[in-house]
């Protein structure tokens, strides 16, 4: 089994209304709510199309639409894809996004990352069929992680923008505020601890990365399963020009996480630091938009 590549990513339209298209998810899922992919479309009648991927558990859908709406005003057909287990795709009895933080089981987490990536690939194919022309991708926070993976698996993404995101699950699991709930679970089930995780990432992860020569990641072959869905594992294969934004006071994505991801990307790239926290980075959305637009034109 190869991560994300064992699943079809041909789009099948289930419903269209107003500016929303609903696709069938090609990833098998136990929750019917996440078996459909809602996509908000903003048509600029352009030969350039950008897909925007939101972050984890975001509460307000309205402000997420600001980026695709703004790209549309600047000449890009744009789309906002709702991630699995979020908003209308949230299973009954759960909160938006919490299924990414509700378990320490690496195999379940891997499947949820994989589900997200397969849905992105399916959506990109839909946008390519509908609008033709060039494709671009932007991911915010968790959306940046799965956008990184998706970009490594395609050769037709012309530009990638990553905001307040990162890789290396040692930093994300043990140094991030948002994953505190996972650390509590680890303390209880003894599956992992900071010392054990650090040894894996210091000793075995570099060797694992060195031995990879393409982004076809075989499942159940890594020393630990989290290597198989870490954005860093895929980032070394990105050839797409990439712009990144790091929040200086980010307690969700540690600095080392962002820098590790940035440093391993082997393409034309730029990194900008913004004087905000993670959530407050939205206050500088116009700066992020302006820098991204300039970068994508180059």
Regions found by a protein language model. Name each.
Residues 38-39, 47-55:
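Short beta-strand element of the alpha/beta-hydrolase
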Residues 238, 244-246, 250:
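Short beta-strand/loop motif that positions the catalytic acidic residue
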Residues 251-257:
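Conserved alpha/beta-hydrolase "acid-adjacent" motif
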């Amino acid at each position: 089994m190869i991560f994300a590549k064992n699943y079809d990513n041909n789009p099948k339209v289930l419903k269209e209304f107003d500016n929303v298209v609903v696709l069938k998810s090609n990833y098998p899922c136990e929750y019917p709510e996440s078996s459909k992919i809602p996509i908000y479309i903003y048509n600029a009648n352009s030969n350039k199309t950008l897909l925007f991927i939101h972050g984890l558990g975001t509460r307000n859908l309205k402000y997420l639409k600001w980026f695709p709406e703004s790209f549309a005003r600047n000449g890009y057909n744009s789309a906002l894809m709702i991630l699995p287990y979020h908003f209308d795709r949230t299973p009954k009895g759960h909160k938006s996004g919490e299924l990414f933080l509700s378990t320490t089981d690496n195999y379940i987490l891997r499947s949820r990352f994989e589900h997200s990536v397969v849905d992105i690939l399916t959506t990109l194919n839909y946008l390519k069929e509908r609008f033709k022309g060039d494709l671009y991708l932007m991911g915010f926070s968790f959306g940046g992680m799965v956008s990184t993976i998706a970009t490594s698996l395609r050769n037709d993404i012309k530009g990638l923008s990553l905001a307040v995101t990162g890789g290396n699950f040692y930093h994300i699991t043990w140094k991030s505020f948002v994953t505190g709930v996972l650390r509590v679970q680890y303390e209880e089930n003894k599956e992992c601890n900071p010392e054990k995780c650090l040894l894996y990432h210091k000793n075995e992860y570099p060797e694992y990365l060195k031995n990879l020569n393409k982004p076809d990641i075989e499942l159940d072959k890594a020393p630990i399963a989290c290597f198989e869905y870490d954005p860093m594992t895929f980032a070394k294969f990105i050839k797409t020009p990439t712009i990144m934004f790091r929040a200086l006071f980010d307690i969700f994505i540690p600095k080392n996480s962002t820098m590790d991801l940035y440093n391993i990307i082997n393409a034309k790239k730029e990194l900008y630091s913004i004087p905000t926290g993670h959530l407050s980075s939205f206050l500088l959305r116009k700066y992020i938009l302006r820098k991204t637009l300039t970068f994508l034109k180059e």
